[in-house]
Design a protein with these regions (language model features):
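Hydrophobic alpha-helical segments with transmembrane-like composition
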Residues: 5, 14, 35, 46-58, ...
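Transmembrane alpha-helical segments and their boundary/interface "anchor" motifs
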Residues: 2-4, 18-79, 90-91, 181-182, ...
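Membrane-interfacial loop-to-transmembrane alpha-helix junctions, especially the N-terminal start
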Residues: 23-31, 125-132, 173-182
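Alpha-helical transmembrane segments and their immediate interhelical/interface regions
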Residues: 1-28, 187-196
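Alpha-helical transmembrane segments of multipass membrane proteins
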Residues: 42, 46, 50, 109, ...
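Specific transmembrane alpha-helix
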Residues: 2-15, 104-118, 138-174, 198-220, ...
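Alpha-helical transmembrane segments and terminal signal-anchor/GPI-anchor hydrophobic tails
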Residues: 151-160, 167-273
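Membrane-helix interfacial "entry" motifs
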Residues: 19-27, 31, 90-94, 98, ...
């Protein structure tokens, strides 16, 4: 899902097709309220809830394997950037709210959009074959690239992929609509050669084409209402931010042996029901 999110973010950032210092500063200001502020508030909320839980449950830690009361000033800062560097933590290089690594990387990419625009604007004036070959070559080469906390090569490439359509003022749905099966077969081929980012590119084409066809069919049938309940649409970001708390509760219940699967069927049911529980509780709290 994350490559698609970066793709859409790039398309929206450059939706005007133009770029200027004033527009750049305006977009950064808007994203300070839509990305940075929620980012800080949610991570601070998680820190508060974890400190309360650690006070209630002695010798208990979650997400970070170090008691919050033992945090140094650096540890507190790392919670907002990369918890893998807190003590012997290791693991994924993400902030305390682990899914927020996407927001962190997106904010960093937004800072570099003047450079991204210059490169893509140059490519937009070249033959389209050059842009296509360069993009696929970079996606293939990215399998050997080292990601830095806050700067994802995958994120940068798919953000640029979406941005390219906006800068060139081409509707990507018009380009991708007839490529449904081509995108799927390409994704399968990329999966077979173990190149995840090329696979994601194919899946984006397949998903956009399929979704466009479904919506067009609904429009022809005069079913213009969006097929998802409004409550799910309105709570999307809250579910994205909150579901890790519910997941932590489920994992704690399993680790403490409160719920123990006795066979493979029960384990499978727990696996299937967990995301349903996370969604239901998150939407309910919202």
């Amino acid at each position: 899902a994350n490559p698609f999110f970066f793709f859409i973010s790039g398309s929206l950032f450059f939706k005007e097709g133009l770029f200027s210092k004033e527009l750049y500063l305006h977009k950064l200001q808007r994203r300070a309220f839509s990305l940075l502020l929620p980012y800080i508030l949610w991570i601070s909320t998680y820190l508060f809830l974890l400190s309360v839980a650690e006070g209630i449950l002695p010798n208990w830690t979650a997400i970070v394997h170090k008691p919050i009361e033992s945090f140094s000033f650096t540890d507190w800062l790392l919670c907002f950037w990369d918890i893998s560097k807190i003590g012997p933590q290791g693991g994924i290089a993400a902030p305390l709210v682990i899914p927020f690594w996407y927001i962190r990387d997106l904010m960093v990419i937004c800072l570099f959009t003047p450079i991204i625009y210059k490169v893509l604007h140059w490519l937009a004036n070249e033959r389209k074959e050059i842009s296509i070959l360069l993009f696929f070559a970079l996606l293939y080469a990215s399998r050997w690239a080292e990601n830095l906390p806050g700067l994802s090569v995958q994120g940068l490439l798919f953000f640029s992929f979406g941005a390219f359509f906006s800068i060139k003022q081409i509707k990507f749905i018009d380009v991708m609509r007839p490529l449904k099966w081509g995108g799927l077969f390409f994704a399968i081929f990329a999966w077979q050669i173990n190149c995840a980012n090329l696979m994601y590119a194919g899946l984006i084409v397949f998903t956009v084409s399929t979704t466009t066809r479904i919506l067009e069919r609904r429009k022809q049938q005069n079913k213009l209402a969006f097929p998802l309940p409004l409550v799910l649409i309105n709570s999307t970001f809250f579910v994205f931010a909150f579901h890790s708390i519910v997941l932590g509760g489920i994992l704690t219940i399993l680790k403490r042996g409160i719920v123990v699967p006795h066979n493979e069927l029960e384990a499978f049911l727990i696996y299937i029901l967990s995301p349903v529980i996370m969604l239901t509780v998150s939407v309910g709290v919202h």
